[in-house]
Regions:
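N-terminal Sec/SRP start-transfer signal
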Residues: 1-34, 44, 337
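Short helix-to-coil transition segments within interhelical loops
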Residues: 11, 323-330, 405, 414
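Internal alpha-helical transmembrane segments of multipass membrane proteins
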Residues: 23, 287-307
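Hydrophobic, regular-secondary-structure patches
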Residues: 36-111, 118-121, 135, 232-233, ...
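Hydrophobic secondary-structure segments that place a key small or acidic residue at a functional site
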Residues: 106-116, 126-210
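Mechanotransmission and gating elements of multispan inner-membrane complexes involved in transport
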Residues: 171-172, 180-286
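Transmembrane alpha-helical interface segments in multi-pass membrane proteins
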Residues: 296-299, 309, 316-362, 386-390, ...
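Conserved transmembrane alpha-helices of multi-pass membrane proteins
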Residues: 354, 366-400, 409-414
Length: 414
C-alpha cells in the first residue's frame, strides 16, 4: 500500500474526528469564496450596466442616489430637471451624446422609463418580437417582466404613479405593448420602455393648453443631441428626470462636472466614482465577513492539529512497528503530513463546492439577474493555496513528533 492510500485509510479510520475537521475547514473556505464570488459578480454587473455612461446629470441631491436611480433603477430620483436646461447643457462642446430619462411611474412594481431608442442601443438590446416604442403611448417590455406577468404584444398597461404596487393609477392613459425585448442580462430586462413624450402625456391629464396669442408654441423643435422632437411649449414647460452623458474628450471629465455643479438646480454624478464609493462602504462589511471566514479556517486548522496529535498518541505502537519493519523516519513524517493535507484538500473541496453551488442557486433565484452563477474567479487560486498552506502548517508539528519518536522506548513500554 502506497503512502497516499495509507493516509486516506487512516483518515477514514476516525470518521467523526475527520468529519469535524472537514466541516470546519469547508465552512471557512466557503465563507471566503462566497464573499469573493459576490463582490466580483456585483462589480461585473455594475460595470455592465454602467457601460458607455460617463456622467449622469439629475436634480440637486445625492450623487449616489442619482446613479442608483438612473443607471440601476433601485432608488428614487432626486427630482426633475427642466427640458430647457437639459437641452442647453447638451449643446456644450464637451458632450458627445446624451440620453434623456423620465422616471417615476411603474406597472405592477416594475419601473416605466421614458427615453429614446438610444437607451436600448446603449446595451445593444434586441427585440424578441414586435417593434420599439414610439411617441404615441406605446411600450416595449423587458424580457423578465414579459415572462413573469405574461405580457404579450397588443396588451394594455395602466401605469401607476410612483414606484410601488398599489399606487394611484393613470387608467385614462394606458400604454399599448408593441414589442418584447430579448433577455440581455442588463437592467433592461426589468424595465418598461416608453417615449419621453408618452410620459408627459400621462401626466398632462385632460388639460388642453390654449395659446391663441402664441400659436407658434405648437411648432416642432428638433433637439438633435437628445434625440427628441418637441413643441416649443414642451421645451419651455416640460421636465425630465436625468441625462446619461457620453464625453466627447477626456478633458470633459474634469470640466463638465464642475460646469454642471455650478448651476443652481443640476447635479453631476460620476458612475465610476460613486460605484467605487459604494464598494468602499460595502467593503467594511466584506472585510468583517472575510475575517470570520479566516478565523473559522484557523479553528479548523487547530482541529486538524488536535486530530493528528490524538491519532499520533493512539498509533504510536503502530508507527513504531512500521519503523521496526523498515519504514524510514522520513516515511513516517510524510505519512502524518499527508494525512493532514488529505483532510485539508477534502475540506477545501467541500468549501469550494458549497460556495459555488450556493451562489449559483442564489443567482438563479434572483429574477432581475440573467447571468449564470457558475463562474470562477482567479483569486480563488489564492484561497486554495492559502488553505493548503494552513493545512500543511497544522500538520508539520505532529509529523515532526512522529519523525522524532524513539521506537525502542515505545516498544519497550508495549
Amino acid at each position: 500500500m502506497n503512502l497516499f492510500s495509507l493516509s486516506i485509510k487512516n483518515v477514514f479510520a476516525k470518521p467523526l474526528s475527520s468529519l469535524l475537521s472537514v466541516l470546519l475547514f469547508g465552512f471557512g473556505v466557503a465563507i471566503i469564496v462566497s464573499i469573493l464570488l459576490t463582490s466580483t459578480f456585483l462589480k461585473n454587473e455594475i460595470n455592465k450596466n454602467a457601460q458607455g455612461i460617463d456622467l449622469v446629470i439629475g436634480a440637486k441631491g445625492s450623487p449616489l442616489q442619482i446613479i442608483l436611480a438612473s443607471i440601476f433603477h433601485i432608488d428614487f430620483p432626486t427630482g426633475n430637471i427642466s427640458l430647457s436646461d437639459a437641452n442647453n447643457l447638451t449643446r456644450n462642446r464637451l458632450v458627445a451624446s446624451a440620453i434623456p430619462l423620465s422616471l417615476g411611474d411603474s406597472y405592477q412594481g416594475y419601473r416605466i422609463v421614458g427615453t429614446t431608442e438610444a437607451y436600448p442601443q446603449l446595451y445593444e438590446a434586441s427585440l424578441a418580437t414586435g417593434d420599439w416604442f414610439g411617441p404615441e403611448m406605446t411600450a416595449t417590455v423587458g424580457a423578465t417582466i414579459a415572462k413573469n406577468l405574461g405580457i404579450k404584444v397588443g396588451d394594455q398597461l395602466e401605469s401607476a404613479h410612483g414606484l410601488s404596487e398599489g399606487a394611484g393609477g393613470h387608467e385614462e392613459h394606458p400604454f399599448t405593448v408593441v414589442g418584447i425585448m430579448e433577455p440581455s442580462g442588463s437592467v433592461l430586462d426589468q424595465l418598461i420602455l416608453v417615449s419621453v413624450q408618452s410620459v408627459w402625456e400621462v401626466h398632462s391629464g385632460h388639460e388642453e393648453h390654449d395659446h391663441e396669442e402664441g400659436g407658434d408654441h405648437h411648432e416642432l423643435v428638433s433637439l438633435d443631441r437628445l434625440g427628441l422632437e418637441v413643441t416649443k411649449e414642451q421645451l419651455e414647460n416640460e421636465d425630465i428626470t436625468s441625462l446619461l452623458i457620453k464625453y466627447r474628450s477626456p478633458m470633459a471629465a474634469v470640466q463638465l462636472p464642475r460646469i454642471v455643479n455650478g448651476t443652481s438646480n443640476l447635479q453631476a454624478a460620476s458612475p465610476p466614482y460613486e460605484t467605487a464609493r459604494l464598494f468602499n462602504i460595502i467593503g467594511v462589511g466584506v472585510d468583517v465577513v472575510n475575517m470570520l471566514g479566516l478565523v473559522i479556517i484557523i479553528l479548523s486548522a487547530t482541529s486538524v492539529f488536535i486530530a493528528l496529535i490524538n491519532s499520533l498518541k493512539e498509533r504510536k505502537y503502530e508507527l513504531a512497528i512500521m519503523r521496526s519493519m523498515g519504514a524510514s523516519q522520513l516515511k513516517i513524517f510524510l505519512l502524518i503530513l499527508t494525512e493532514g493535507i488529505v483532510l485539508t484538500i477534502i475540506g477545501s473541496a467541500f468549501g469550494f463546492a458549497l460556495a459555488h453551488l450556493g451562489f449559483a442557486i442564489l443567482v438563479d433565484s434572483m429574477e432581475q439577474i440573467q447571468s449564470s452563477g457558475m463562474f470562477f474567479v482567479f483569486d480563488e487560486y489564492k484561497v486554495m493555496l492559502g488553505s493548503l498552506t494552513v493545512g500543511i502548517f497544522a500538520s508539520i508539528i505532529p509529523a515532526f513528533l512522529a519523525y522524532k519518536s524513539d521506537i525502542s522506548e515505545t516498544l519497550s513500554k508495549a
